[in-house]
Amino acid sequence: MAARGGAERAAGAGDGRRGQRRHLRPGRVLAALRGPAAPGAGGARAALAAALLWATWALLLAAPAAGRPATTPPAPPPEEAASPAPPASPSPPGPDGDDAASPDNSTDVRAALRLAQAAGENSRFFVCPPPSGATVVRLAPARPCPEYGLGRNYTEGIGVIYKENIAPYTFKAIIYYKNVIVTTTWAGSTYAAITNQYTDRVPVGMGEITDLVDKKWRCLSKAEYLRSGRKVVAFDRDDDPWEAPLKPARLSAPGVRGWHTTDDVYTALGSAGLYRTGTSVNCIVEEVEARSVYPYDSFALSTGDIIYMSPFYGLREGAHREHTSYSPERFQQIEGYYKRDMATGRRLKEPVSRNFLRTQHVTVAWDWVPKRKNVCSLAKWREADEMLRDESRGNFRFTARSLSATFVSDSHTFALQNVPLSDCVIEEAEAAVERVYRERYNGTHVLSGSLETYLARGGFVVAFRPMLSNELAKLYLQELARSNGTLEGLFAAAAPKPGPRRARRPRRLRPAPGRGQRARRRRHAGGRVTTVSLAEFAALQFTHDHTRTSEHHVHRLASPWCLLQNKERALWAEAAKLNPSAAASAALDRRAAARMLGDAMAVTYCHELGEGRCSSRTRMRAPGGVCYSRRGSFFGNESEPVEGQLGEDNELLPGRELVEPCTANHKRYFRFGADYVYYENYAYVRRVPLAELEVISTFVDLNLTVLEDREFLPLEVYTRAELADTGLLDYSEIQRRNQLHELRFYDIDRVVKTDGNMAIMRGLANFFQGLGAVGQAVGTVVLGAAGAALSTVSGIASFIANPFGALATGLLVLAGLVAAFLAYRYISRLRSNPMKALYPITTRALKDDPGRNRPGEEEEEFDAAKLEQAREMIKYMSLVSAVERQEHKAKKSNKAARLLATRLTQLALRRRAPPEYQQLPMADVGGA
């Protein structure tokens, strides 16, 4: 049986060219083709000997081995037993041996690495019977490989992405108006009530603004306006008009500035029981914020007023075609108008075009500016300093790795001229591209072509500027120079105007745009670009493209791999002719023996031999002056060993046909079980462990990252502030402004005290002033006296209003009540018993007289005449007593009125006739 090594057996008579071909095998074609070899075609004698040996080997394997210990290898033949025993091969130190503590740690590491590499080696022995042709195989033909394109057209560049501009156009405006407050009051005896109050906002006339407000920083204190279809004139404080100076508002807040003439609400009070109306006129100038949204046909003020006129309406540069809802008489545009600085009150030096519009309630003034230079329907969203454009299915895909987003558009450029108010895009995008190029690509790339714009899905406009690396640009220039054959062509190609031509493969014909693409073009042909508020679809598209890119990497590997397999099939066919057993073992992934049967291959599988049933010879010299090219071995049972040779990879070959001429300095390593054995000069030297041999691997690792790791960034098309600032009116600003209005232009902390006396005095003064000079003189005297009286009354009222004065007044009232009660009792007693009331002591003495009603005396009867005289006398005496008492009090108090009354009483008594009575005898009086 032929061996698998590099030597051959001794040539027989019938070998021919087949033996020579096997002798010229040049080693291994591929490392994966290692495997057992099949015997070649030998002579008749060799074939017969091989058949006999294989029959013997089959009988030995089939015989039962029970009762025969096979643990020891079979003994060598007698001629080989006298040979010296091979020296014991040193075994490598174990991990716990003495060598582990040696200082040479590198040796231990290398040994451990070799042991780890040798752990996967196969130490089993195989016996391969010769293929008989029962199993015939053939190599599979080449397979068709999947077609994979070379890739799409990729263009590197710088991109600027634009979105719909939803932010309103804001500007400063000045409003002029007069706040007219009319208050109606009714005055009672001790109080006043407001029965009605209304407020009107009156626009300031344009002539008053230009000639008085913006020129002198003053304002008239009267207002003329229409109310209910009637012309009404209102005067501040119901007084003659005058030029009131403007003063800053009481409250200063960011973005809130205003000026006014008064902070008082005039309230007039009339006489008791009458109605009175008072008017206050407050001239107010406010700086407000104005907002206008697309299509800019109106604008709103921060006060809540909406002006139905475009902020770009004017009388020049075609601005008269802008929208307006007011009559021409209400609008006025002044060229070269000098504004006044609201903070300092000084006139500015730069003239402007000033618009004035008088509405129903306010007069609005703002600076006119051209429309196309100040508003843009698109706003810059993001800048992509590294953008890649590629073609896919007739569309362009713009991938920005810095945004983790991919935008898909048509393959045709988008004409921005069809989008209204989009002039800012080209200018702003070119400036951004130039800035990015200077900062990052100035030394490595060159710009190629001009700025291109594309309308991406979702309403995004992509401004893309292609560029080339310097190396690629040089290659293109060299190609153009070779194609032109002159230096002029090179210089012409280097000129920046035409730009370098891209050396790409012929571009495929683009498919005609579909119905959806045509619809999108018609929709954006003359209208505004509308952008979605979410950009997750761009991130999903980027994820899809990222995954497809990884898939394309696999496809690019699969297609060349298939082509490589088809090419290697020819190598397999040739390897099968050189070593069919090795080729069959590698193809079948199993140890097999094979031989070629023309264009087919006969295959038979090898069988594994148990452990301890194989031994080897120590010498490799054969009789006849030749040597064995493979070491000899014995395998099988101990009683009937089979003599053969050790082939490659522990394959046992029956027979000893592999010989070679003996050479000097012979050194060979043969695989034997789990280790190698070393022979020198055809004699056994020692056993070599696998760890002592360095490993040369022919295996190429495939380190393939199928899906690259990416971090996705959140895409926020519109910020929260932009979404909150989209409307025409900012209701929070309007509410804030309305709540601050009273604090800014009126004093809410001042208390106005109403004085009715002053109202009376003012009324009297107005009355006497209407009578002329004489009336004014008389009025001065009367008003002086009335003022003194009012002061007295006010003093008394103030005294009573004081707590101590109220207590004193209460005590006086109580004392007066007690005195009145006592006087009433005195008068009552006087009426009932005058004598007792007038002479209480005399009557008490008469009552207590002991001589009255003596026992034994009779009571005398009263004389009627005497009784009447006594009564007259008592009456006269009472009058005299009263006169004396009154005279005494008058002298004591020195009052003229009382003295006068006393004299009159005395005169009355003197004129009275003498009393008509008779003198009584003394006996009647005292009893003497």
Curated annotation (Swiss-Prot):
Write the signal peptide boundaries.
Answer: 1-62
Compositional bias (Basic residues): 499-510
Q: Name any Gene Ontology BP term.
A: virion attachment to host cell
Q: How is it modified after translation?
A: A proteolytic cleavage by host furin generates two subunits that remain linked by disulfide bonds.
Q: Where is the composition biased (Low complexity)?
A: 1-12
Site description Cleavage, residues in chain: R505, P506
Chain intervals for the UniProt region annotation (Disordered): 1-25, 67-105, 495-525
Binding partners and assembly: Homotrimer; disulfide-linked. Binds to heparan sulfate proteoglycans. Interacts with gH/gL heterodimer.
Q: Does the keyword Glycoprotein apply?
A: yes
What name has this protein been given in UniProt? Envelope glycoprotein B
Please give the residue ranges the record annotates as the region Involved in fusion and/or binding to host membrane.
185-191, 270-277
Annotated disulfide bonds: C128-C606, C145-C562, C219-C283, C376-C424, C627-C662
Membrane spanning residue stretches: 804-824
Biased composition (Pro residues) is annotated at 71-95
- Topological domain (Virion surface) residues are 63-803
Q: How does it sit in the membrane?
A: Single-pass type I membrane protein
Positions glycosylated per UniProt: N105, N153, N442, N484, N637, N703
Residue numbers on the Intravirion membrane side:
825-928
Q: Where is this motif: Golgi targeting?
A: 876-879
Where is the motif (Internalization motif)? Answer: 917-920
Keyword entries, A-Z: Disulfide bond, Glycoprotein, Host cell membrane, Host endosome, Host Golgi apparatus, Host membrane, Host-virus interaction, Membrane, Signal, Transmembrane, Transmembrane helix, Viral attachment to host cell, Viral envelope protein, Virion, Virus entry into host cell
